[in-house]
Design a protein with these regions (language model features):
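Hydrophobic packing and interface segments
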Residues: 1-412
């Protein structure tokens, strides 16, 4: 990971120069400071910090999970899930905190007095999202390639060539496999979702500056940040439902998603009264979309519940408890070719409902509030991100714990 971040740091430095020349230079007659480039560097640095924090959390929690599972499986589950929770709340909390500090700093430096200057302020801040996405590209794609290369390489060397079990201490590739889980599924996934959150929030902030009503009602511009903060609060309340002692881990994790979605749906209602009473009045392509408070609420809810549906559909097609994977396992009895054909067909089929969910969400949101509605829907889809990250972090931590147990020859 040190090598990855070194290469990434060099790339970000070069890209920052491009941002300076392409974006900040035209503003030099008005603003002497490279605001967009600075926001880009802050976004990239925050994303890398989130990835590092995730790696530290995963490596601290995995061996503790192994030890506690040897005593009581429920205690091991608690440690693994709490590790995921720390990762989730750190990432979303840092993303929101640094973005708010950046906005306040730029506001104090620029002192915007009219709509045009406010628009410039948030255009400068948009570099924050670009920085997060740049790191996400390396973390998700580069980390994912390393993860799969280490996984397949360890399996080929161990199970195929040497005929030894998976995660056997006799196979040195096992260590690379476990490290790969952290690099791709912790650091890479965290950077990816950080970039998505930063981009969608910055997009909503920029679009909101096209509304004179929202600029006059100053608090209304920060409505996207309020929605993200409500998501953190809803996820914090929801985490207490995870520690009901049960052997049904999958059910417990699904309850987390359901409860956080329902809570956030209710908690957003008081927040919509921050928006102008007469409507947001978003300008797009020469037309004004005067969406009401409740229409903005519908946009957020569409994104929120679409995200839940997509997660549940993904779980249905990939869980070993459900029909699709069982049918795929039966196809494996007839050879590798039926396995590949059925697996590919199953992957295609699993995308149908998510595509329709996304299409309907974008279409309805755009009809209600133009691009502002689409941005709010994206923020809504990421509303329960702390819980989603908790569940995503739980996977690699528990997987690493299983690998450590196998290498240590612990009892099942």
């Amino acid at each position: 990971m040190r090598k990855e971040y070194t290469a990434l740091g060099i790339f970000c430095a070069l890209f920052a120069v491009i941002v300076l020349c392409a974006v900040d230079m035209p503003w030099n007659s008005h603003h002497k400071f490279p605001y967009t480039m600075f926001a880009f560097i802050i976004g990239a640095g925050t994303s890398m910090l989130c990835g590092y924090i995730g790696m530290v959390i995963a490596t601290v929690c995995n061996y503790k999970t192994t030890y506690l599972c040897n005593i009581d499986r429920f205690d091991g589950f608690k440690v693994a899930f709490q590790g995921g929770q720390v990762l989730g709340f750190c990432l979303v909390g840092l993303a929101l905190l640094i973005l708010e500090i950046l906005i306040l700093s730029y506001k104090a430096a620029l002192k915007p007095e009219d709509g045009t200057e406010v628009e410039h302020l948030f255009e400068f801040v948009s570099g924050y999202g670009l920085g997060g996405s740049t790191v996400a590209l390396f973390g998700r794609v580069g980390g994912g390639i390393y993860t799969k290369a280490a996984d397949v390489g360890a399996d080929l060397a161990g199970k195929v060539e040497a005929s030894i079990p998976e995660d056997s201490p006799k196979n040195p590739g096992t260590i690379a496999d476990n490290v790969g889980d952290n690099v791709g599924d912790i650091a890479g996934m965290g950077a990816d979702l950080f970039g998505s959150l930063a981009e969608s929030t910055c997009a909503a902030l920029i679009v909101s500056t096209t509304s004179s009503a929202m600029i006059e009602t100053h608090e209304a511009i920060y409505f996207p940040l309020i929605v993200t903060a409500i998501g953190i609060a809803a996820s914090f309340i929801c985490q207490f439902f995870a520690y009901i002692k049960t052997d049904q881990v999958e059910t417990t994790l699904k309850v987390q998603l359901w409860v956080s979605t329902v809570l956030m749906s209710a908690m957003i209602i008081p927040a919509i009264y921050v928006l102008p009473e007469e409507g947001v009045g978003i300008m797009f392509a020469g037309d004004i979309y005067n969406a009401s408070r409740w229409e903005c609420y519908i946009c957020i809810i569409l994104g929120l519940w679409s995200g839940l549906v997509i997660g549940l559909i993904t779980e249905y097609y990939t869980s070993k408890e459900n029909t699709p994977t069982r049918e795929l396992a039966e196809a494996c009895e007839y050879g590798a070719a039926p396995n590949i054909i059925n697996g590919l067909a199953l992957g295609y089929l699993s995308t149908v409902i998510p595509i329709f969910c996304l299409a309907i969400t974008v279409l309805v949101s755009f009809k209600l509030a133009a691009m502002y509605g689409v941005a709010l829907a994206a923020i809504g889809m990421l509303g329960c991100l702390p819980i989603a990250l908790s569940i995503d972090g739980y996977g690699p931590i528990s997987d690493n714990a299983g690998g450590i147990a196998e290498m240590s020859n612990l009892d099942d």
